[in-house]
Swiss-Prot record:
Gene3D superfamilies linked: Lumazine/riboflavin synthase
Binding site for 5-amino-6-(D-ribitylamino)uracil: 22, 57-59, 81-83, 114
Spans traversing the lipid bilayer: none
Gene: ribH
Protein species of origin: Haemophilus influenzae (strain ATCC 51907 / DSM 11121 / KW20 / Rd)
Record family assignment: Belongs to the DMRL synthase family.
Name of this protein: 6,7-dimethyl-8-ribityllumazine synthase
Amino acid sequence: MKVLEGSVAAPNAKVAVVIARFNSFINESLLEGAIDALKRIGQVKDENITIVRTPGAYELPLVARRLAESKKFDAIVALGTVIRGGTAHFEYVAGEASSGLGKVAMDAEIPVAFGVLTTENIEQAIERAGTKAGNKGAEAALTALEMVNLIQQIDAA
């Protein structure tokens, strides 16, 4: 029986981290977690990490698509924060970011890790950006690396 399972060490992986500027005080913590995980755990070289900033989470899918189409990256990590407010805006932005990033992954056949927080309030966002609920940016980065390795194994099998 053959079992394929990716590891998180990917020293030669080229990774784009796409980060929304809106809610930057949260997103910068996600970015710090992602970069730390890529370098320290994934052993990705500094020169193989590209950071791209978008205005907000809604713009993440288009930028991720362009990066995927460039064929310069093995994986993309998308980071952002969408916090529910008093209008339907939350549903539109969160839904489009989620479905758009998923579409990029499927269409381009490249791992696109979803590190976009979709929370009810600021407290939940802070908890998920490096306090008691961990750092979802770091988790997304490690997911991206594991998927890079898993896809390589599938292609070689």
